[in-house]
From Swiss-Prot:
Produces ATP from ADP in the presence of a proton gradient across the membrane. The alpha chain is a regulatory subunit. ATP binds at residues 170-177. CDD domains: ATP-synt_F1_alpha_C, ATP-synt_F1_alpha_N, F1-ATPase_alpha_CD. It comes from Anaplasma marginale (strain Florida). It catalyses: ATP + H2O + 4 H(+)(in) = ADP + phosphate + 5 H(+)(out). F-type ATPases have 2 components, CF(1) - the catalytic core - and CF(0) - the membrane proton channel. CF(1) has five subunits: alpha(3), beta(3), gamma(1), delta(1), epsilon(1). CF(0) has three main subunits: a(1), b(2) and c(9-12). The alpha and beta chains form an alternating ring which encloses part of the gamma chain. CF(1) is attached to CF(0) by a central stalk formed by the gamma and epsilon chains, while a peripheral stalk is formed by the delta and b chains. This is ATP synthase subunit alpha.
Amino acid sequence: MSIVSSGDILKILKERIEGFDSPVKTSSVGDVVAIKDGIALVYGLSGVKFGETVAFSSGVRGVVAGLERDTCSVVVFGEDREIREGDSVQCTGELMTVPAGLSVLGRVVNPLGSPVDGGNAIVADSRLPVEAKAPGIMARQPVCEPLQTGIKTVDMLIPIGRGQRELVIGDRKTGKTAIALDTIINQKKTNDTADAKNRMYCIYVAIGQKNSSIARVVHKLKETGAMDYTIVVAAGASDPVSIQYLAPYAACAMGEFFRDNGMHCLIVYDDLSKHAVAYRQMSLLLRRPPGREAYPGDVFYIHSRLLERAAKLSDDLGGGSLTALPIIETQAGDVSAYIPTNVISITDGQIFLESELFHKGFRPAINVGLSVSRVGSAAQVKSVKKVAGSMKLTLAQYRELEDFARFGSDLDPSSQAMLEKGRRFMELLKQGQYSPLSVEEQVAVVLAGADDCVNGIPVSEISKFERGLLERLRAEHGGLMSSLSADIADDIKGKLLEVIRGFAASF
């Protein structure tokens, strides 16, 4: 009987183990040490990366937001009441992704990409990472195509181009969301006749809004037929702060699908003030040191890295665009606060809405003097440029003269005439909600004011005159109107002024 030594046994075992080729998948597993206010402290996840998605044994997911020597802090995306101390946590080795593509259009989803409209599950064309690097310098081209909002004041004086970041800023209840919704609704005119590549797809992101407000927005988009080309990403006020924080990044990833495939997308962030508050709350729970107004030191970076993803790509990369309309809410018109100044410095201009104008009945309540578009004028249509050239000067002179008149100063006849012209111009710029105008209609209306065609009409009758003029032009001068969409030749301008003066004389 032969004796087998321990060395032989070890050699045989080693050969057997080395010859064992069954695939084995290893993953890092840890345990929940503590869970509070949507933040889980996890021990034992060796090799986990910052920003990596982890899965709890209850099925809830989270993302790693802080790393220590033996533990990591995980932001929970969902209800933390389902998580208990001692639950196992597993690394996934993946980053956070959301569904993207044409199949998501017309749906209301949460920031995780799950439908919340009661419809069927979304079968996505692709899944894209929530956090993505913004396009570099050479990947971009200057803004060169206009994005029509349908709002006279914006399209004429503060034009927006495809790929621009234009801030909408103002106090609560001054019509910020109304401007964004009108812009989305106005895209229907273009989208009904354009092919898939030239359509303007839209994404509306509700951050920390009341569920009733989100429902009202969705209802209006459906009612106007705009939901067909729109995605609504909803993170309500009752959702965890982690979900509210994730919302704009998830929506931006959905918009990047269109941008990177040579298409065009408009994204509305409503609003980034609440997003900053959600991030502040999350950072304090993660025990990060607070700074000014208790915001963490990187609050500027969370918005800059988001808004830099909006761009007009070069033709080599398909020429697609992602246009951003971030909304910021101010307190008592204070634009010098921390978050407003941050976002103003990041964006390419701002549309400033004023409570005083709103309460006077001037709507949209846009303060033209404080509003600016730094890059959009390069994309303005030629016909619009020609008629809108003198508008800013006229309105600035009117504001100055109005201040003099308010103090009872006597004005000479020319100043009095300028004041009367300015009043009629301001009245012409008024516009009802959900009633966007085409470029041709805007050119006709502004031309009527610029060439003194409305001087003899009482200020109280200007709105009625505008409605009647547009009805006459649509019904009897369709050919003349269609020629205004690109440029306005002198003979066309003469014919249009003849029609306007004739209507004004018979009004």
